[in-house]
């Protein structure tokens, strides 16, 4: 058996050489190199097994882009980022235009980005004056008659009544004199000491003519006596009433 093995090997070599001679175009690539040995890595079960643990040092974050804003509020209030019709709310210096920039601009020349449209408003919108119902002239008087003036409002206060909140009274056109005004006011407020004989404004000036009455002002009604003490006229002397610009408040009247 030992002598037959070399013969078989020689026979095999002859057969392989014969096959290669019969098929000269066939190419047999060389065998692949052997695989490297497998390295077994032990399993790491906790973060302490990693020498590069992330909790030891703070991770390096990417650098932020420089935008020129300190915080998010400066970014939101930057007028350079407003587009469309909202950018018309600010002028070229970034200052707000007020109500002129908040109006609906399309009511004037449309919402458009075309430079040919003058859609920038630099002042508040001025409302167009409405035409009067009655045209002044002879024709209006013939059709509608003479227009009477609107009644003036007076806030009446009783002298010495510190709890009086005021009584509204309208000076109608049929009141032609101060005596007629005194009679109508007496029926309206029922004064304490008697009928109304004298009327004072907030500057403690006596009203002697109907033309001196200011629409919406306060007036103190007395029966001829002087005004009461200051502590009983606090509501009457409050500052919410309209007075004439030429009137002055003398300080000697406010001595308690």
UniProtKB/Swiss-Prot annotation:
The name on file for this protein is Doublecortin domain-containing protein
A GO MF term: tubulin binding
Q: What happens when the gene is disrupted?
A: Reduced tachyzoite growth and host invasion. Loss of tubulin at the apical complex. Abnormal conoid morphology characterized by a shorter and less rectangular structure a weaker or absent basket-weave stripe pattern. Cortical microtubules, the mitotic spindle, spindle pole, and centrioles are normal.
Tell me the Gene Ontology biological-process terms attached to this UniProt entry: intracellular signal transduction; microtubule polymerization
Organism of this sequence: Toxoplasma gondii (strain ATCC 50861 / VEG)
Location within or outside the cell:
Cytoplasm, Cytoskeleton
Q: Which gene encodes it?
A: DCX
What domain of life is recorded for the organism?
Answer: Eukaryota
Any Gene Ontology CC annotation: cytoplasm
The record's note on its domains? The doublecortin is involved in the binding to microtubules; however, it is not sufficient by itself and requires the partial p25alpha domain.
Q: Which UniProt keywords apply?
A: Cytoplasm, Cytoskeleton
According to the record, the residues making up region (Partial p25alpha domain) are: 71-103
Looking at the Swiss-Prot or TrEMBL record, what is one Pfam family this protein matches? Answer: p25-alpha
Q: What does this protein do?
A: Specifically required in the formation and maintenance of the conoid fibers; the conoid is a component of the cytoskeletal apical complex, which is composed of a left-handed spiral of 14 fibers made from a nontubular tubulin polymer. Promotes the organization, curvature, and stability of the conoid fibers, and probably bridges other conoid components to the tubulin core.
Q: What is its main location?
A: cytoplasm
Boundaries of every Doublecortin domain copy: 152-226
The UniProt entry, under SUPFAM superfamilies, shows: Doublecortin (DC) (SSF89837)
């Amino acid at each position: 058996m030992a002598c037959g093995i070399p013969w078989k090997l020689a026979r095999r070599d002859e057969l392989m050489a014969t096959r290669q001679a019969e098929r000269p175009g066939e190419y047999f690539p060389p065998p692949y190199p052997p695989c490297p040995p497998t390295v077994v890595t032990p399993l790491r079960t906790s973060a302490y097994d990693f020498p590069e643990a992330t909790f030891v040092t703070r991770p390096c974050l990417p650098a932020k882009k420089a935008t020129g804003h300190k915080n998010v509020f400066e970014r939101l209030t930057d007028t350079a980022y407003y587009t469309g019709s909202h950018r018309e709310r600010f002028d070229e210096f970034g200052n707000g235009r007020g109500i002129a920039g908040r109006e609906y601009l399309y009511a004037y020349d449309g919402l458009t980005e075309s430079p040919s449209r003058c859609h920038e408003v630099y002042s508040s919108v001025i409302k167009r004056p409405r035409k009067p119902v009655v045209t002044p002239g002879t024709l209006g008087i013939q059709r509608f008659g003479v227009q009477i003036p609107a009644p003036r409002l007076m806030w009446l206060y009783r002298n010495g009544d510190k709890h009086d909140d005021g009584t509204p009274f309208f000076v109608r056109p049929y009141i032609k004199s101060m005596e007629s005004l005194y009679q109508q006011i007496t029926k309206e407020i029922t004064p304490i000491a008697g009928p109304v004989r004298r009327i004072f404004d907030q500057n403690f000036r006596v009203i002697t003519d109907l033309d001196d009455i200011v629409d919406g002002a306060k007036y103190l009604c007395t029966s001829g006596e002087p005004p009461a003490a200051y502590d009983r006229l606090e509501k009457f002397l409050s500052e919410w009433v309209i007075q004439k610009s030429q009137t002055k408040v003398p300080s000697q009247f406010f001595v308690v």
